[in-house]
Amino acid sequence: MHLHFTPRQIVEKLDQYIIGQKDAKKAVAVALRNRYRRSKLAENLRDEIAPKNILMIGPTGVGKTEVARRMAKLVGAPFIKVEATKFTEVGYVGRDVESMVRDLVETSVRIVKEEMVVKVQDKAEEQANQRLVEILVPSPEKQSGFKNPLEMLFGGAQNSNQTSDTQEDVEIEKKRQDVERKLAAGLLEEEIVSIEVTEQQSSMFDMLQGTGMEQMGMNFQDALGSFMPKKTKKRKLSVKEARKLLSNEEAQRLIDMDEVTQEAVYRAEQLGIIFIDEIDKIAGKQSNSVDVSREGVQRDILPIVEGSNVATKYGSVKTDYILFVAAGAFHMSKPSDLIPELQGRFPIRVELTKLSTDDFVKILIEPDNALIKQYMALLATEGIEIEFSDEAIRKIAEIAYQVNQDTDNIGARRLHTIMEKLLEDLSFEASEITLEKITITPQYVEEKLATIAKNKDVSQFIL
């Protein structure tokens, strides 16, 4: 965990991936730093301080989700994104709101498990190599298959065979040492071996996914799995692939699942972040009789956000200190349309601004994962170096902004459709092009995009 970052450092890290939205970055940076501050307090005072939940307001594609996701990734906190519209009021078929907490704990378990696996990786690989040696040079018992039953009962011929057995053991030990050296040197990577691996069985309870009954299915599955034998199957693989499978099996044996569960539940409770998207879609005091009550979903979310205990397969989880970040465009409604109790649970309000042409220019070139860098890297695999002139980048940004104004404003996501259309022919013909370097000019952008962008009827379907 990396909770030691200062708010300024967090904002600087977020600036590497997200353009603009300073207010949103500051809000999440302070929320993260307050978690660090809270961890330094005496226990009696620590229990009194709950995180201040955040409500992000802004149109689609301006970075609401990305700010929260990058924040969680930065500190290694368990993070999940859910859509408020996916939940239904208690009593209706569909996902209940408590499933978001169960999903968060599952994510936390996965993160902790991966960390534990990394810690035991060297030992697991060592044991996997030992198993490979035994597979490549099997012991005499495995080679001979079975012994004479009378010999096993009465010990006949034991003395006469003892010397030959000892010699055979020495021979096998020499062979194994030789194989160990070759494995360490990587000389047997393509050798084919037959190994037994635990079969991953698809559960009949998978059909319960999305019905709100997943927890019941998991409990049944755990109960059955405790006394049902695990199935194994033989697979023929190269030594390289077999080592990966065997290392994974050995790592699973080496880690203590009780320790994993304990740490995962602690992280989910104390450091977890739940991002509730499209919360504006359940705002509104009126509801049609044929629809599942949106206000009912809000009332179900309320106790989770306020702080309650949720039963999961890993035990009871407290939601008192989980940070909730809600987001919505609020085109058709406003934050005050949420029920007053829920409004009060999101004291920090942040409004994200619409993206300008200058923002689009920065998005195209500045972030570490900038869109233009991605396309340059993709086409470089075909031996083609493409570069964009500054004027061409400005032209792309202007067209993206104009199309957003003329049709639906989908923010930075518009750049993906614009870039795909711009480089469509080049991507199609890349494997046949003999040129090593191609420069994208404003004229090329104009030729590929301007006509479509100017025609409103066409652009709303293509761009």
Swiss-Prot record:
Tell me where in or outside the cell this protein is found: Cytoplasm
- Amino acids binding ATP: 19, 61-66, 277, 341, 413
Lineage of the source organism? Answer: Bacteria, Bacillati, Bacillota, Bacilli, Bacillales
**What does the record note on quaternary structure?**
A double ring-shaped homohexamer of HslV is capped on each side by a ring-shaped HslU homohexamer. The assembly of the HslU/HslV complex is dependent on binding of ATP.
Which GO cellular component term is one of those annotated?
HslUV protease complex
Name it. Answer: ATP-dependent protease ATPase subunit HslU
What is this protein's function per UniProt? ATPase subunit of a proteasome-like degradation complex; this subunit has chaperone activity. The binding of ATP and its subsequent hydrolysis by HslU are essential for unfolding of protein substrates subsequently hydrolyzed by HslV. HslU recognizes the N-terminal part of its protein substrates and unfolds these before they are guided to HslV for hydrolysis.
The species this protein was found in = Bacillus cereus (strain ATCC 14579 / DSM 31 / CCUG 7414 / JCM 2152 / NBRC 15305 / NCIMB 9373 / NCTC 2599 / NRRL B-3711)
Q: Which superkingdom heads the taxonomic lineage of this protein's source?
A: Bacteria
Q: What is its main location?
A: cytoplasm
> Which residue spans adopt a coiled-coil conformation according to this UniProt entry?
none
SMART domains from the UniProt entry:
AAA, ClpB_D2-small
InterPro entries in alphabetical order: AAA+_ATPase, ATP-dep_Clp_protease_ClpX, ATPase_AAA_core, Clp_ATPase_C, HslU, P-loop_NTPase
* Molecular function, one GO term: peptidase activity
What Pfam families has UniProt attached to this entry?
Answer: AAA, AAA_2, ClpB_D2-small
**Keyword annotations:** ATP-binding, Chaperone, Cytoplasm, Nucleotide-binding
Q: Which PANTHER family match?
A: ATP-DEPENDENT CLP PROTEASE ATP-BINDING SUBUNIT CLPX-LIKE, MITOCHONDRIAL-RELATED, ATP-DEPENDENT PROTEASE ATPASE SUBUNIT HSLU
Question: Which family, according to UniProt?
Answer: Belongs to the ClpX chaperone family. HslU subfamily.
Single GO BP term: proteolysis involved in protein catabolic process
Enumerate the transmembrane spans. none
